[in-house]
Amino acid sequence: GFTWDVFNDKTLKVRGGSGFFTGRIPLVFFTNMPTNSGMIQNLVSITTRYKDGKVINRDPRLELLKGNMIIDVNQMISTLGLPTTITPEEGVLPSGIVGIDPDFKMPQVWKTSLALDYQIPASFPLTVTLEGMFSKDINAVRQFNYNIKSPEDTWQRFNGPDERYIYPENYLEHTNINSANVLTNTSKGWGWTGNITVFAEPAKNVNIMAAYTHTESKEISGMPGSDANSAWTNMPSINGPNNSGLMRSRYVTPNRVIASINWRVHVNKRSTSNFSLFYSGYSSGSYSFMYSNDMNGDGVTNDLIYIPKTKDEIKFTSAEDADAFWKFVNQDPYLKKHKGEYAEAYSASAPWIHRFDFRWSRDFFVKIGKTKNTLQLSLDILNIGNLLNSKWGVTKNMSG
């Protein structure tokens, strides 16, 4: 990174940096593999039962485990006399198999930022900051189901403007299991953030801050699940989760405005009070328009809709249904703007939420010996606007 004081007087600074950042994923996606590997698994419970402090039942196999802890799997199998083979009749085939790409890497992203701080000539301190950051996925994470056949040109498609593939009845590579999900990497994701922030002190002991941030982020998968299978089946798509392509990140907040004002009052030499009001405005979430059934026959019900462009592109059983549908489309900003297109995942935004928080604090200065100490008493009222109107500061999300 770097910081450049352009005029050597701190009125204009340019700063930036670039680097690679590595994180991790929830460990449940690693534990999915040994528990869903399709290999022989044997659960052994060896216990000793006590009653009134006396042993009433002791598993004789405990004697076999005396000494150093056994950490070799084969030695453990041999010591306990566990089976090393199993017949098809004795085994239970899992409905799905989970694996991890042997070349899998932890999530890694390349981030580059550039910012400008400018002190505007004014009768009071006034600073404007412009910031931009671009990120590129080096090793993003996704699930890929290798038991699903890839679409081919010989497959049938929908007739009309919606030309998505129709999966055949034999779309599974192996019919004796439903899925073979593999945790793997992709490098196709990217994102950028732009921010403008204004700091001002228009009067003594009065500080004002206001900022606006816009964010765009595209990804292959946000891993929307608690295990390998749900992280794959919950991905919105047109031609199946394996062929989802880049989509807007489900975790991004496209637009956000924040502001604060703080007034510091000197009560006396031993005490000051602070009054602060904080504002935050943003869309409370994003959602996708999807069919409620499995439109393309891939066994997943998260199919993104096609938004008809004209009335002749879609048929209804009654005129009332048609009127209700087009009334809904034309009142929704996203659907109205994207007629004739497939709906993009997580691109429709929930209503904005405007929230105010209030904070009052009182600082008491106490000198003990030669040391000056501060004792603070504070009161926080979160979402204070909701106390005035029950509809203010309320988050609205999709229920299904």
Named regions from a protein language model:
Residues 43, 94-100, 174-183, 238-245, ...:
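Extracytoplasmic loops and strand-loop junctions of Gram-negative outer membrane beta-barrel proteins
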Residues 82-86, 272-369, 376:
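Extracytoplasmic gating/loop element in the C-terminal half of outer-membrane beta-barrel translocons
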Residues 348-349, 389-400:
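C-terminal beta-signal and terminal closure region of outer-membrane beta-barrel proteins
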Residues 6-12, 121-125, 202-205, 266-275, ...:
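Short loop/turn motifs that connect adjacent beta-strands in outer-membrane beta-barrel proteins
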Residues 3-182, 351:
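Solvent-exposed loop/turn elements at secondary-structure boundaries
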Residues 129-270, 274-285:
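Gram-negative outer-membrane beta-barrel transporters
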Residues 108-110, 190-192, 253-257, 352-356, ...:
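Residues that define the transmembrane beta-barrel architecture of outer-membrane proteins
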Residues 2-4, 114-118, 196-200, 210, ...:
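Residues on the lipid-exposed face of transmembrane beta-strands in outer-membrane beta-barrel proteins
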